[in-house]
Amino acid sequence: IVESQSMAGGNSVRATGGMNAGKTAYQDENTFGEEAGVEKTLKSAADSYADNAAVTELAQTVTAQWQAYQANPEGYFDSVELMELDTMIGGKAVNDVELVKALCANSAEAIDWLTTIGANLTSVGSFGGASVKRIHRPVDADGKTISVGTYIVPVLEKACQDRGVEFLFD
């Protein structure tokens, strides 16, 4: 790994939010109360992006998922497609659709993988652009949410070192 600075992480070490991931086990530990967020996203898709085939198709899928959830509200409502829809709307529907699909489809697996190397992003909360609680953040020993960058970069650096990955600094 080539780092332009004398330490690992670059701008990532400054990240304070968390990592967005859809349909994770950590989300299921929360009580769902974001009905208004889902409705707002579906309305935005219909009102502002009716001429965009990708957004319209996602909105149709999410509408069916949302109706099924409302008929049988078990667990926390989220889906890969809702995350895709939020991402497309956040990008004003000019996103690379295939890249959005890849990002969203692999997001829960990424959270699971991070857990295997000791990067536990167990706190799930709301953040701008997401219709539901989807941002995964680390917590300290007291259960207080902490900055993701200063937490995750050392964990990732150690995982790389444990696997013999060479770092080149400066």
Question: What role is predicted for each listed range?
Answer:
Residues 79-87, 91-170:
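Conserved redox-cofactor binding core of oxidoreductases
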Residues 1-54, 121-125, 137-170:
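Residues forming the flavin
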